[in-house]
UniProtKB/Swiss-Prot annotation:
It comes from Homo sapiens. Homodimer. Interacts with NR5A1, NR5A2, NR0B2 and with COPS2. Interacts with ESRRB; represses ESRRB activity at the GATA6 promoter. Sequence repeats lie at residues 1-67, 68-133, 134-200, 201-253. This is Nuclear receptor subfamily 0 group B member 1. Residues 205-469 form the NR LBD domain. A motif (AF-2 motif) lies at residues 461-466. Keywords: Cytoplasm, Disease variant, Nucleus, Receptor, Repeat, Repressor, Transcription, Transcription regulation. GO terms for cellular component: centriolar satellite; chromatin; cytoplasm; intracellular membrane-bounded organelle; membrane; nuclear speck; nucleoplasm; nucleus. One of its GO terms (biological process) is pituitary gland development. Homodimerization involved an interaction between amino and carboxy termini involving LXXLL motifs and steroid binding domain (AF-2 motif). Heterodimerizes with NR5A1 and NROB2 through its N-terminal LXXLL motifs. It comes from the Eukaryota.
Length: 470
């Protein structure tokens, strides 16, 4: 009857029958197919095809074919549609999944309204849930009353559970926290935690430095175990005894070997044809700048090994007595503790090498020995160090720059022929030269040559060795 045209359509009797039909069909409407179908269409252009009644012979004429989902359901806007949708929302509220109020609490946009989150468990309607543009989750808008209540309550419950948060070990003292919490919403035991931040260095979640949670001590055991967990200081660290003065354990043997290495180094430099064409002043500028680095390469090639011992600095009384002796012309006898080699300078004028400075020298030697550098490779590295166009006071910069570039090209071709594969060998050899930046020329002079040359300057030594035949 729903799809037929009657001659009584529009009459009073026809309207009464149709209104009674709608009243009886309304209670049976929930038995229609209401399982997650399309409830949002508003057209209802096509009437239901072949669906003229429900089970039991009850006629339903308000079912329409949806143009989107292709299913038969009541027309949007009708009384039956409103009753069914309101009943569906009320019935489905307790089954809605729990609102995830976890990771992202920091967004302030709330530009998109909450999608499909009409209430919290228990049927309590919540209209202040917004879709976050960062995390994609639905949570209250920042600045609303609900947001303030939830965040303040969350922080209040976090404080007692803070000692069990993962401290992150050695990265605990970092102050860079660029990322938000990384999915750690709870600690063991079900205690909520929202003040854990993802460290951009170690990737662990721990309290932000400077916060109240960060200042709370983790536990008594951790406070007692902190000195034991601290790693050893590296050689470049100036703390924990790295600046203690040291001296050679066998100075006579080591100083003689270092002097022989310096002679071989200057002999190698002087008889280079490309170095001999330079004026004497330009030769002196280059040698004074790089003699220490060239000597370190020579000592690594000779595989010089040495040991150091810790020495005590001269006391204030020794310094006063030594200064008085210099002022009086040496008439007063020196105390026994201040007796030194006749070529050595006064104690207060010397800068004794420290343990960290000596360790830098040993690290460079160990690096060279681990690479098994050949004689030709040592020669090319010395040429790279010698012809440095960035030396202050150099006049023939273009010429020196060309020599350094040519030396690097020869070294690259040599490593390509002797070591098959990519240029890893060439890169490793040049990386050893970077370690020379941590070695001070004055430390080498004090450690290896001061007991022999006394107060003579190393610059004067370079000039004398360049002008004489060696």
């Amino acid at each position: 009857m729903a799809g037929e045209n009657h001659q009584w359509q529009g009459s009073i009797l026809y309207n009464m029958l149709m209104s009674a039909k709608q009243t009886r069909a309304a209670p049976e409407a929930p038995e229609t197919r209401l399982v997650d179908q399309c409830w949002g269409c508003s057209c209802g252009d096509e009437p239901g095809v072949g669906r003229e009644g429900l089970l039991g012979g009850r006629n339903v004429a308000l079912l329409y074919r949806c143009c989107f989902c292709g299913k038969d359901h009541p027309r949007q806007g009708s009384i039956l549609y409103s009753m069914l949708t309101s009943a569906k929302q009320t019935y489905a509220a307790p089954k809605a999944p729990e609102a995830t109020l976890g990771p992202c609490w920091g967004c302030s946009c709330g530009s998109d309204p909450g999608v499909g989150r009409a209430g919290l468990p228990g049927g309590r309607p919540v209209a202040l849930l917004y879709r976050c543009c960062f995390c994609g989750e639905d949570h209250p808008r920042q600045g609303s009353i609900l947001y303030s209540l939830l965040t303040s309550s969350k922080q209040t419950h976090v404080a007692p559970a803070a000692p069990e948060a993962r401290p992150g070990g050695a990265w605990w003292d970092r102050s860079y926290f660029a990322q938000r919490p990384g999915g750690k919403e709870a600690l063991p035991g079900g205690r909520a935690t929202a003040l854990l931040y993802r460290c951009c260095f170690c990737g662990e979640d721990h309290p932000q430095q400077g916060s109240t949670l960060y200042c709370v001590p983790t536990s008594t055991n951790q406070a007692q175990a902190a000195p034991e967990e601290r790693p050893r200081a590296p050689w470049w660290d100036t703390s924990s005894g790295a600046l203690r003065p040291v001296a050679l354990k066998s100075p006579q043997v080591v100083c003689e070997a270092a002097s022989a290495g310096l002679l071989k180094t200057l002999r190698f430099v002087k008889y280079l044809p490309c170095f001999q064409v330079l004026p004497l002043d330009q030769q002196l500028v280059l040698v004074r700048n790089c003699w220490a680095s060239l000597l370190m390469l020579e000592l690594a090639q000779d595989r010089l090994q040495f040991e150091t011992v810790e020495v005590s600095e001269p006391s204030m009384l020794q310094k006063i007595l030594t200064t008085r002796r210099r002022e009086t012309g040496g008439n007063e006898p020196l105390p026994v503790p201040t007796l030194q080699h006749h070529l050595a300078p006064p104690a207060e004028a010397r800068k004794v090498p420290s343990a960290s400075q000596v360790q830098a020298i040993k690290c460079f030697l160990s690096k060279c020995w681990s690479l098994n550098i050949s004689t030709k490779e040592y020669a090319y590295l010395k040429g790279t160090v010698l012809f440095n166009p960035d030396v202050p006071g150099l006049q023939c910069v273009k010429y020196i720059q060309g020599l350094q570039w040519g030396t690097q090209q020869i070294l690259s071709e040599h490593t390509r022929m002797t070591h098959q594969g990519p240029h890893d060998r060439f890169i490793e050899l040049n990386s050893t030269l970077f370690l020379l930046r941590f070695i001070n020329a004055n430390v080498i002079a004090e450690l290896f040559f001061r007991p022999i040359i006394g107060t003579v300057s190393m610059d004067d030594m370079m000039l004398e060795m360049l002008c004489t035949k060696i």
